[in-house]
Amino acid sequence: PSMGADEDNQEASEVTILSVDQPALSLSIPKAWEDIAIIKRQTDIQQSAEAKDGTLLFQLYEKTAYTTDEAMGNVWSLVAFTKDAFKEKFGDADLATVIGVESYVLGSDSDYIYLLVRPSDVQFLENDDTSLKQYKQLQQESQVVLAGFLKDNSITVNEDCPNSSCYKVAHGANK
């Protein structure tokens, strides 16, 4: 018997589900990413000084770059803000624009606002074709992962979210 596999989403059948507790959320990632990515969860992440400005949930890294230099390889981070913390940090930010350096409001639920945070500088190894190829693959495949994150956790999609290299709103798909 298939455990919760969507008929309309065969390619996602081979997934690893990661979860965090504060807030309780899950992220389904393709099993194939095991070879090319490192995913850190809240429990693995040393909360930076920014923790007061939101809770880091998940971080995706390209494996070749990250194993060479832990300051490299970041593809994106998912961050949850309470509504108050969000307002304190960003004020009355326009959710249809990129906020901060490169942050995108993916959606919200009754308690939190969820941001996709992209690095502002090059994160793959520029002299390494494998790193570049894998980095681009992770960016492309993140669309399904991030859309799934919103759907699986019943997060209301920010329909005005600007397009990023990792995520675009699929208009009308989750009405």
What function would you assign to each model-found segment?
Residues 89-90:
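Extracellular/lumen-exposed scaffold segments
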Residues 13-17, 24, 103:
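Short, acidic/polar N-cap/turn motifs at the starts of alpha helices
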Residues 22-85:
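Secretory pathway targeting signatures of secreted, lumenal, and periplasmic proteins
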Residues 26, 64-74, 114-115, 121-131:
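Short, surface-exposed beta-strand/loop "edge" segments at domain boundaries and coil↔beta transitions
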Residues 1-18, 161-175:
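N-terminal, intrinsically disordered, polar/charged segments of Gram-positive cell-envelope systems
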Residues 97-108:
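Short, surface-exposed beta-strand/loop micro-motifs that present aromatic residues
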Residues 116-175:
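Surface-exposed amphipathic alpha-helical segments
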Residues 31-32, 108-113, 119:
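Short, solvent-exposed coil/turn segments at beta-strand boundaries
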